[in-house]
């Protein structure tokens, strides 16, 4: 009896300077999810196909609560202290002296929980349209070209960090109680595949998208956000005009920010923009997960998970086949 899921189709090609197809991406994400957060779970009759269960078992009230055991490649159900009956046949199974059937388990994993779904979790902010693998692949390919995330190792590190940041590609919005600690407050909490946070980062990305230069007006002190800066200079006659311009644009930025959690284009593009802006391509080239994580997260929060996800993205993308290694 197999206690693992049927293996998904694996890819053997190198992804350097190559677009993902929808099938490529689905296969990679499925493989990663199958290997993520796996724990063995006992199986019960309630989760077994009813038409495969012998009527012998169904005559008992609450028969679905019975755990399933395995003995010599046969699934069996225990009655009393020592009696076991075949799950499929309902006939008694003779257990040899000194032997004991064991619980039948299946691995629960991220794939068991999420399947092939993408960014489907019901959060305060979610994608306005259901996401397909075709669209997700298109957006990733465009971002990879635009921001030079163009080799296997760069893409592996990028996707592994995104996988953690988005809770396994289920949401592009940070549901958290710590939002008050971000500069600018809850309007500027984490959004996107790599969670963009703080008002000054949103302003910088707004400038990048709209080809504006409002961030140059923000001459901050250490630890000071844009909103804090506006408050500080509002009474300064020489900076009053700057304060007014920043105040007006930050209202636009506040409205724009939600695009990063509701529109997959901005969710992907903002992450890739952040990646290149912070020279993460060059860091990823060194294959140093810790260094990448510190740059993304500002510390080592979740480092063991980031290391593990990087490892399994390498396996899923068959990094051993990479032509640029």
Label the predicted regions.
Residues 170, 189, 194-197, 261, ...:
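Generic, ordered loop/turn and secondary-structure boundary motif
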Residues 176-185:
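N-terminal cap/lid subdomain of alpha/beta-hydrolase-fold enzymes
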Residues 1-156, 160-176, 211-212, 227-231, ...:
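Cell-wall glycan-active module
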Residues 212-215, 219-222:
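Short acidic, low-complexity segments enriched in Ser/Thr/Gly/Pro
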Residues 150-154, 186-189, 262-267, 287-289:
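Extracellular/periplasmic catalytic domains that process cell-envelope and extracellular macromolecules
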Residues 254-262, 297:
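Active-site rim elements
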């Amino acid at each position: 009896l197999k206690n693992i899921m049927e293996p998904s189709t694996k890819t053997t090609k190198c992804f350097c300077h190559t677009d993902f197809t929808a099938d490529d991406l689905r296969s990679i994400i499925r493989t990663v999810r199958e290997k993520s957060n796996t724990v063995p779970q006992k199986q019960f009759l309630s989760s077994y196909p009813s038409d495969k269960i012998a009527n012998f078992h169904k005559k008992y009230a609450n028969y679905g609560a019975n755990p399933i055991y395995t003995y010599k490649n046969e699934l069996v159900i225990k009655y009393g202290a020592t009696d076991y009956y075949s799950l499929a046949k309902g006939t008694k199974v003779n257990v040899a002296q000194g032997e004991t059937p064991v619980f039948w388990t299946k691995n629960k994993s991220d794939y068991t929980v999420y399947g092939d779904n993408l960014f489907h979790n019901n959060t305060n902010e979610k994608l306005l349209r259901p996401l397909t693998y075709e669209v997700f692949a298109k957006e990733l390919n465009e971002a990879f070209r635009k921001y030079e995330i163009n080799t296997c190792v760069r893409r592996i590190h990028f996707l592994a960090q995104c996988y953690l940041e988005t809770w396994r590609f289920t949401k592009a919005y940070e549901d958290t109680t710590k939002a008050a600690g971000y500069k600018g407050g809850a309007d500027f909490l984490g959004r996107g595949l790599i969670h963009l946070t703080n008002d000054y980062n949103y302003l910088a990305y707004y400038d990048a998208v709209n080809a504006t230069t409002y961030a140059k007006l923000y001459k901050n002190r250490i630890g000071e956000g844009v909103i804090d800066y506006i408050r500080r200079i509002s009474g300064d006659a020489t900076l009053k005009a700057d304060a007014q311009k920043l105040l007006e644009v930050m209202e636009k930025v506040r409205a724009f920010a939600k695009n990063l959690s509701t529109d997959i284009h901005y969710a992907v593009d903002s992450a890739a923009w952040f990646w290149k802006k912070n020279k993460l391509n060059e860091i990823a080239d060194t294959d140093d997960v810790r260094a990448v994580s510190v740059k993304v997260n500002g510390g080592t929060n979740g480092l063991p998970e980031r290391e593990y996800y990087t490892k399994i993205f390498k396996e899923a993308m068959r990094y051993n086949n990479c032509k640029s290694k």
